[in-house]
Structures are given as structure tokens and as C-alpha cells.
Amino acid sequence: MAIMIQKRNGRKELLDITKIQKMSMEATKGLEGVSQSELELDAHIKFIDGMHSKDIQDALIKTAVEKIDIDVPNWTFVAARLFLFDLYHRVGIATHGVKGEAYCHLKDYIKFGIEAGRLIPSIADGYDLDELNAYIDPSRDLLFNYLGIKTLYDRYLIKNRKAEPIELPQQMFMAIAMFLAQNEKDKQSKAKEFYDVISKFEVMLATPTLSNARTNRHQLSSCYIGSSPDNIEGIFDGYKEMALLSKYGGGIGWDWNQIRSLGGVIDDHKSAAGGTVPFLKITNDLAIAVDQLGTRKGAIAVYLEPWHMDIVDFVDLKKNSGEERRRAHDLFPALWISDLFMERVMEDSYWTLFDPYEVRDLSETFGDEFKAKYIAYENDESITKDRMKAKDLWKKILTSYFEVGSPFLCWKDTANRTNPNSHVGHIRSSNLCTEIFQNTNPNHYKIKLEFEDGTVSTYEESDLVVVDGGVTKKANKVSALDSVNGKRVFIVEKEKIDGDTAVCNLASINLSKINTKEDIERVVPTAIRMLDNVIDLNFYPLRKVKATNLKSRSIGLGVMGEAEMLAQHQLAWGSSEHFKKIDQIMEAISYNTIKSSSDLASEKGVYPTFEGSKWSKGIMPHDLAPQAVNALVDKDLFDTSYDWDVLREKVKKDGMRNGYLMAIAPTSSISILVGTTQAIEPVYKRKWFEENLSGLIPVVVPRLSPETWAYYTPAFEIDQLQVIKAAAIRQKWIDQGQSTNIFMSLDKASGKYLHEIYTLAWKLGLKSTYYLRSQSPEAKNDVEDRSMECAGCQ
């Protein structure tokens, strides 16, 4: 009896077994350890009259996915190809493509995308689309493993209003390249250049750029960093700012250190202030209420310095016990730690807590200046203070870190001491993922007196104003009952002067593909050019954010795939060979990144605040690294391929296009997309499961073989002191920071070990550590938890 199947478009046709055989043959062709017959037999497809063609495709994909295992990892590519065949078909139906052709002409893709309201109408302006269409290489789709193509489909491919995909991977990459190259003089060749590095997975842009470049909503930045002043206007203006940034998908880092503490003075009334926690509770609710386009709740890290009198409550924010009104479970607390605090911990001496209302300048200083002011305030009997053993507070911090994974730790003095733009500002906090370190400044508020005759006068809050009757008042005490120079005051308001909110524009080099001197020299200039273009093409939710980004022209080029690269080269994690290899790679990336930005400065101009920067003085990131870091790498004094003195002179002469250059983000999503290991981290396990809308997907580390097996050491089996040392070697070469996670097995955990890890991080010049991930040695849960990760930096 003839069996009829129902196609996706509703049409019925006779079942043709040869089509299924042809598809399974194509899916398995050239892949070791898999076979066409095994796929077809194990699928157990029961052919029933009237069945849907989609059911056949789904059965084959499901079979291939379930067969992914340590000894047969190539089934992931079989599943990816089967998924791609289905995707080609679905996009063809949605866009009315030509039957039998996976990729329609670039012109047709763009026309359909614009008509659907998904592509920006100017995307093709000035391009030869026939030439670019011929340049697209559909065979690069075969680079995807199954989880990679599923991630691309779920998170990045443009869909129509019915949630049907209307673009294919190479169309997406070309459209992104065209968008980023649109202002280049030779945009045609630059679009090809950009397309090559991203479609070959040599460099990958961060999630917001991948998602939004080419669309009408081209918000391309990953994270934002801001600060709130200690007044009600500034705090609530900050809420509005956070809401708008979260609305457009940005992760947020926010400094709260200027907010007066619980029991502080308000308007000369003692014990009137509610402290930071009530305001952080509102921030917590804001993160939930203003989600990221309905996909996930907002993500906000909140920063405080350990001398703030609210520090104990702050450390307890995510604690599962205690008064719920004092908890903020959806925020990510982080500490902004001075060298002085760490020294007091090491000395086992006392630590003093202050109300920032009484010690305003502690937030504005670092290093020796901070230390001198702090000690002076300790000795000032007129200032309200509290004391506790520094080691007791440190123990509380580490206990919370171990129990709930936070607060993250960031080192204030190291961040500011190495700040290339310390001449024009101060670093007050990091971002959500603790890899971005840039100047920020809270909004400033002046007193505006509007008189009944319509005239206006403005004053600083502390300015003295003589009102009629001869009484002298501070400007912030003048009211509508007063007159000045015979003019009756109509209303007193505060006028906002925008501060600086920093922006992170990110991309990552895939070390599993780019790890030689020649390849680094080839791809880094392209990556820097793309990121620099992001600054000018970005949609900014707020004027002040755009102004800050144009002033510093900040970017963050990082890396991913370090663990895969080490396994390829058969280098053990934490070995001297690992340290030497990563030192060589990071030096090459640092040198070429700085050179590329300087080359761009010659072509397009320097960033506005270049003069006076460390760059302008020829000071490079590695010049500021602790001497102890150099001792970690076994190399001769003159063992370098690069002439840094020549580069110093070039930078002093030609300038820099970008004020901040390098930062290593977590890269969770984009490393999955390109099929490599996450950022700089050792692997979680050799095999684990990723949770997806489709269920649990087995994942095997890339290129696993008998030769690489021993070099994929699971993260929880590695001495975490070696993780810190590797991070210190990378940090030597980068001007910003890196997201460094620590992995702690419960059978190895102790207060002493945690203390050793984090004090070593401080001593070796790390600017931050991110999550502390703990695991029971007998844990059977092989599912990777990504619920706490920032979407933007990935």
C-alpha cells in the first residue's frame, strides 16, 4: 500500500524512502565514527499513512543527538547537518525561496527582511550585492555542531512575526558585516573581511551585536556601568537609567558607595537614613519588572566598598535565611576592595566602618591618598564609626562567596593604578561580569532658583545665598518663602548635570583557531576595526551613555577557547608550558591590539581624551604588572618577538583610537555558538548536558580523542591557585580585566584554601574574580547551570 506523507505546507505526496536515505547519507558523509545505516536503523521510524514529514526529520535529529558521547563525538555534527537541512527548508518556505536551493540571492534575503520589518532599510546602500552574494560560502555552515546551530537558531537568527526563521547563518554573518562596514571608505572589501573572520569562527562578536547589528533596533553594547549620588533625585534618576538600559538588553554594574548608611544623618536629623538596602530592594524589583525584551529578567551587579557601614547587610543580600525585607536575591553583589583592607586582613588588625555622608572623599581616592585619608578619619573622634576585626569581615565575605557564589571581589587600587585614563576620571566599580574597568561619574545636581519674574539662577548646593532680610543660607536651604535681591522665589528645583556611564562593546578571538603569531597579526586589526565601528553605529538608550562612549571610544577585545587550544597542543592546564604559551599569545594579542588602535588613530583620529593618558606617555599594560607575575613564566629576559619600544614611540606620535582596549568576557553563548570551550576557563567536564528549550543536549568537549583526553582536566580537579596564576599572566597584558571563575569541590574546600586563592589574586594584580562555583564530589548533576550568566557579555 502506498504511504502518503504530509508536507509542512499542507501538501500531501507519496513517501520517497530515497529522499530520507540521501539526507542521512549527506549528514554522515566524511565524519569518523558515524554511519548512515546506524542512523536510519536507530531512528525506528514507523511509516504511517498521513504522517508529517517533520516527524521524520525530528526522529533523525533526536537519534543523532542521543548518540553523542565521549567515544563518538561526531554525532553532534550529524545532528547539526540534519538540523540545517530542516532550517534550509523552513526558511525557504517562510521567504518563498526557490525550491531546491538552500540559499536565495542576497538581494532577495535583504528585500524580504526589509519588507518584514526586520532588517534596517539602509543595509544594502552602496554595496554590490551580486559580488557579496557570490562571496558567501554556505559550506561554512558545516562548522556548526548541534548545540551551536541550535543556539544560533534560538537566540540570533531573525524571525518573522510568526516566529518563523527568515535568514540562514551565512546571510546573518554577511548582513552583520555589511552593517558594521557601512561607513568604511572601501565598504565592499571591508564587508568581506568582516564576514570572513566571523563566519570562519576566528573572531566572534558579543551577543547584542550578533543579535541586533543589521536590525532596526541596533543596540550593540553588552554592559553598562553607572553610579548613584547621595540624593533622592540622583537615586531615582539612576533607577530610570537602569530601567532603560535593561529594557534594551544591557547588563548593568552600579556603584552605590556614596549612599549614606543605615542610621545616617538627613537634614541634620540623626538616625534618619534607611541605608542602602531599601534602595537595593527597589533595584532588585526593577531588575525583575524591566526584563530584557521578555527573554530573561534584568541583570544588575551592585557595588559597595568594605568600609561602608552597611557592609555586613550588603554581604548578606543573597543569604537564604534572615529577614526577607533585607534580602535582594535577584541582584549580584560585588565588593570594591582597597589594598588597605587586604593589608589589615593579613595583619589581623582592626577595620573601621564609616558613613559615606561623613567621609565623602574616600570614594574619590585610591592608593596612598585613600590610605592617608582613611587613617585620618579613623583618628577623628568627631566622625561616626564602627570597628571590627578585618579578618572577621573577610571570613564573612568568603563564607558568603562559598555559600551563594557572591559577592564578587574587585580590587579598587589595582584597577585605578593601572587605569590608562586616570587623568580624566576615576574607576568606581566594574560591570556585571567583572571584566570591564572604565571611568564613571554620578550625575551632579545644582540648585535652580526660579523667580516669579521668570528669571533663573543656579548654585552649587553648598553655595551661600544672601536672602532678603540679610540672612545667609546654603543654596539647598532656600525656599519659595524667600526673596533674593528683591525677587520672590517661585520654585526651587534641582538641575541635573549628566555624569559618565561607561559602555562595553565586546568581541572575542577564538584561540582554538587563532593562536599563532601570524594569525593573530592577521585577525586582530579586523576585530579592532569592527569594534571601533560599533561605537559609531550603536543605538544608545541615553544621551549620557553615547557621550561617555564617544569620549573614551572604549572597546573590549577578549579571548575564548583557551582550554581547547591547550588540548590541541597537548599542554596540561597549570603547567609551566601552559603559562609560557598563554603569555606568548596574550603578548601577541596585546601588541597587535594596541598597534591596530594606533593605526586607526592615524586613519580616523585619536579618542578625545588621549592627551595626558598613560597611552600618550608610552606606558603599556605590562609595564604596570607586579614583578611577581613575571616570575611565573619561564622565559629569558629577551625572549620576545615584539619591539615594545618601537610601539611606545608610535603610540606617543600617532595616538590611540580607543581609550580602553582589552577585556576577557565570559563568552558562554558565543563559545557554544562556535563550538569551542568557554573563554579562559578549564572545562566543566569532558561530557555534560546543556539545558535547552528542546530538553537536555549532550555535549562533548571539542576534538576529544585519545591524544587530547588527558589535557582536558575538569575544572574542579585543578588546583585553583594555578587558575589564579594563569589569570595573572593574562592580566599582565590587558588594560581592563577578565571574568575569572573559581571552581571548588566540597572535599577540597576550607577557609584556609579560599583565603590563599583570593589573597594570591590580589597580590598578583588581578582586578577581579567572578563566581565561586562549588560542587559536591559525589554530585551526579552533569547539567551546566547558566541561569546566573549575563546575556550581554556572552
Region spans (language model):
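Core nucleic-acid recognition elements
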Residues: 11, 34-174, 189-196
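Alpha-helix capping and helix-loop boundary segments enriched in small/acidic/polar residues
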Residues: 11-15, 164-167, 189, 208-216, ...
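Terminal amphipathic helices with adjacent charged low-complexity linkers/tails
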Residues: 75-116, 150, 337-341, 358, ...
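Catalytic alpha/beta core of large soluble enzyme barrels
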Residues: 121-151, 437-438, 531, 535-536, ...
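Function-dense linear segments that define catalytic or interfacial modules
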Residues: 158, 171-191, 195-221, 225-268, ...
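Polar, glycine-rich mid-to-C-terminal structural blocks
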Residues: 316-317, 325, 329-397, 401-404, ...
